[in-house]
Amino acid sequence: MDPSKVKIPPMKDLTVDNITENVIRINSLCQDERLKYVLERLVTHLHDFARETRLSTDEWMTGLRFLTEVGKICSDVRQEYILLSDILGLSILVDSIDHPKPPNSTEGTVLGPFHTHDAEPLTPGASISHDPAGEPLLVVCTVKDTHGNPVSDVKIDIWETDSTGHYDVQYAGRDGPDGRCIMTSDKEGVFWFKAITPVPYPIPHDGPVGKLLKLLGRHPYRPSHMHFMFEKGGFDHLITALYLRNDPYETSDAVFGVKDSLVVDIGKAGPEYAAKYGVSEDHALLTYDFVLVSDEETSELRARNSKEALDKLGRKVKIVNGLPVPDLD
């Protein structure tokens, strides 16, 4: 960039009171309206935070060192930044904003740091876990749209821990995926598989995020759950999970992921399911009916929610590519 050819506003004599407007002014050279808007709001809130808390140099440097340590511990199988976002409630907030749900559809929740891309496609009824110590569980689910129609050929990514509360990627000797798979819904929207009953477990707390939780007086535990991710053209991407009722951490999830509509009971197969799926009548059973939202429904709801929320803040915006930017017309 040649400074002589760019209209850069003069920035001198910067103070506590005028630094924010000057940073925003020079960032306004950005041609990307969305990026410019995001940075304008970020700088505003970041500077207001520093002014409101009277942030000290030592605290500022402590924060920078903390973020450096978060980055250092990240790897292909451990994403500490996702953990940080999770324990601050940002992950669930962003999901709720970007993937709004109409009534009676399945709510989303956090992805977590242990999803992988090497899960293998399995046929209906296959077992996703090879843990002999886990309590066997039959899982039978349906996928429908918001009008009650079955949705076939949905790609469903599923993952859970073993009976000790560890995901496969947490083992140094991992030689392939376990406790995870990819299923596809049939023409009736049904998919079913054999798993083990989920157990509660702590998120990794041997790193900087764990140290932060300890300083805050918070525990690192997540309630018993099983992850699901749904993908099909024409439908909004759904990341969700099912949580077991009466788990000791049901109301204090370290990453704020539990929603009432996602809390389920483990029952028994009984005569009907036992005969149909080849298990004993007292075999543990989990059933759930997932409801996907179309891209069109999601786009309309997201735009409406954005306009309403920002109107309340007195901000005039327009929707561009599904996201709000200032409306200067």
From Swiss-Prot:
Database matches in CDD domains: 1_2-HQD
The entry's keywords: Aromatic hydrocarbons catabolism, Dioxygenase, Iron, Metal-binding, Oxidoreductase
Positions with a binding annotation for Fe cation: Y167, Y201, H225, H227
Catalytic activity: catechol + O2 = cis,cis-muconate + 2 H(+); benzene-1,2,4-triol + O2 = maleylacetate + 2 H(+)
Cofactor note: Binds 1 Fe(3+) ion per subunit.
EC code: 1.13.11.1, 1.13.11.37
Induction notes from the record: Expression is slightly induced in the presence of caffeic acid, p-hydroxybenzoic acid and protocatechuic acid.
Cofactor: Fe(3+)
Outcome of gene disruption: Leads to reduced growth on protocatechuic acid and the accumulation of hydroxyquinol, when prcA is also deleted.
MF-aspect GO terms: 4-hydroxycatechol 1,2-dioxygenase activity; catechol 1,2-dioxygenase activity; ferric iron binding
GO biological process: catabolic process; catechol-containing compound metabolic process
Entry superkingdom: Eukaryota
Uppermost EC category: oxidoreductase
Assembly with partners or alone: Homodimer.
Family from the record: Belongs to the intradiol ring-cleavage dioxygenase family.
Role according to the record: Intradiol ring-cleavage dioxygenase involved in an alternative pathway to the protocatechuic acid pathway since it is active on hydroxyquinol and catechol but not on protocatechuic acid.
Protein name: Intradiol ring-cleavage dioxygenase hqdA
Organism expressing this protein natively: Aspergillus niger (strain ATCC MYA-4892 / CBS 513.88 / FGSC A1513)
